[in-house]
Amino acid sequence: MERVENTARLVSVYDDLLFDLPKNIEVSWYNLIEILSGEEIFEQRYKVKDERNVVKFLLADDTNSSSMLSSLKMVRENIRTTRDAVPKETWELINELDLYAQQNIKQGINRSERHLFLNTIIEGCQKIIGLFAGAMSRDSGWHFLIMGRYLERADMGTRILDAAVSLMLKSEPEARIQLGQVTWSKVLKSQSAYLDYRRTVRTSINGAKATTFLMNDPCFPRSLAYCLGQIGEAATKLPRAGLITAKVDKLLEFDYPINSSEDLDEDFHNHLNDIQIAIIEINHQITENWFHFRQGDAA
């Protein structure tokens, strides 16, 4: 569910960004494929790296297991097989959302109605997430749900930042000031962070401060620090959590100084990549720890 929402957010922010950029600044949609590490699968399916093919790949392609429709299909199957553990209204809501997405996917692929389509998907996801929050017992099922949600959110949050940084690095130096003003405002809005940033940071928006907020703010529910904290807290409510919490704590302790927009360079891009690898490792450890566990395994 988190992946469905975040994919919609990613496409939406990129669409908004390209719409607002000055005409003399050229940006490729294929950047999104690179950020999501989907080059190999994409190039097996498409010869042209244009907007339509990229958006179709991210939203509708059934050969892409991370596409929005593929993710919705997996969510629907997961809810079908766990109906006894989730609120009974969930099955109806996911069916409605899945049906809407399938019947209206052309709106998402075509530019003219994309914004409305993606907003409807995001709202549908938030409705289901709100139902979980208000009606699920805080037992082991809830804690696994929280870990999965915030792992996905942390991963996609770093990829959205990476998309912005890559966009800035690929632009001409003389265009970066103008580009930065648009880019970082859109990034904050894509994470529903614009007002929280203005209230918390209380300065004009720039790359360094926006990135620091989305990486380190302890209270904002889409910041990397908050997501990792939620993963660690949920893990402690389950048995054999030692390896998980150790990996989370190690990631939380690593501080990357960002003093100016010049620090958002290739080294920072590599830092984000390292975080994504660490998140994948935490995900694998969760699988090994609780789903492939054998009596006598260390944890």
Where are these regions (language model features)?
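Alpha-helical transmembrane segments and their helix-helix packing motifs
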Residues: 1-299
